[in-house]
């Protein structure tokens, strides 16, 4: 995997010791050409982000969480919706997930695309199940549905990078992910709420441990999970001045990040939404 370095200076000279930091050096886990492709297409495939023991640790942690939250899981399955079971606040629930806070293969790309001042919007999972009598796929959707029409002169376009990390192979049994390249730049229309194919869509099948990084407003959908359970993580980044994801309600009062923040450094605090504003 090709890498290159970026250096940023945050123009905050009146407060050089403030919560933004002033000088940042980022070793980006991607080539400039790959970043340009990401800019234009709205998605970037990263093969083999996790392999061997690292992949198994994530699978085991998610399986443990699925069993602990079995009531929510069973309700999601009974609801017969194609979204499956979506546990939230994963970094508060297992050290294995908290270890992803500074995962450079994705974090460095987020900083290359959005600047050094980024935070975690959240870490969630989505588990879909085969079976009769329910929907097995998701409709077309976007994750940052806040664009108004017409666009105001000083409208702040929302940017978000969602890293879809697949813990199982994507194939015809588990369901591939479909995307529409370039649709993240379509500010004049929203994604349709249908399951059917649309013009220009691309189907992506990757091996377990791989990731598909998408702009939060890229049109995408999950194809049917027909014969085997599909597990995925959703690791999301935004600029520090965007709030964290509202989905999933309040974080657990006994969550792991509370104690972690007591001794966290500037970067860790920023990633968890404390600091990075001025």
Where are these regions (language model features)?
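Active-site rim elements
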Residues: 94-99, 199-201, 220-223
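Non-heme Fe(II)/2-oxoglutarate
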Residues: 2-25, 211, 218-278
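Non-heme Fe(II)-dependent double-stranded beta-helix
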Residues: 2-41, 47-148
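Catalytic core of non-heme Fe(II) oxygenases with the double-stranded beta-helix
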Residues: 131-205, 244-248
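Short, solvent-exposed loop/turn segments at secondary-structure junctions
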Residues: 50-52, 125-130, 145, 170-172, ...
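A structural signal for short, well-ordered beta-strand segments
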Residues: 123-125, 163-165, 233-237
């Amino acid at each position: 995997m090709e890498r290159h370095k970026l250096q940023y200076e945050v123009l905050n000279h009146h407060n050089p010791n403030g919560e933004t930091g002033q000088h940042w050096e980022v070793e980006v886990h991607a080539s400039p050409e790959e970043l340009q492709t990401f800019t234009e297409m709205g998605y970037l495939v990263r093969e083999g982000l996790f392999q061997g023991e690292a992949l198994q640790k994530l699978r085991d942690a998610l399986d443990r969480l699925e069993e602990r939250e079995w009531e929510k899981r069973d309700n999601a399955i009974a609801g017969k919706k194609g979204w499956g079971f979506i546990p939230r606040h994963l970094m508060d629930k297992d050290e294995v997930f908290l270890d992803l806070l500074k995962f450079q293969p994705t974090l460095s790309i987020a900083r290359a695309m959005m600047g050094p001042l980024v935070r975690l919007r959240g870490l969630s999972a989505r588990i879909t199940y085969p079976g009769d009598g329910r929907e097995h796929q998701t409709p077309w959707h976007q994750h940052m549905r806040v664009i108004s029409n017409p666009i105001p002169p000083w409208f702040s376009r929302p940017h978000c990078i969602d890293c879809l990390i697949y813990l199982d192979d994507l194939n015809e049994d588990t369901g591939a992910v479909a995307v529409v390249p370039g649709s993240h730049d379509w500010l004049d229309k929203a994604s349709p709420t249908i399951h059917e194919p649309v013009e220009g869509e691309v189907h992506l099948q990757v091996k377990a441990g791989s990731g598909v990084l998408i702009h939060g407003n890229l049109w995408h959908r999950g194809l049917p999970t027909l014969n085997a359970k599909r597990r995925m993580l959703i690791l999301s980044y935004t600029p520090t001045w965007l709030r964290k994801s509202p989905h999933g309600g309040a974080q657990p009062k006994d969550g792991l990040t509370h104690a972690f923040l007591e001794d966290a450094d500037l970067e860790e605090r920023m990633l968890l939404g404390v600091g990075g504003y001025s």
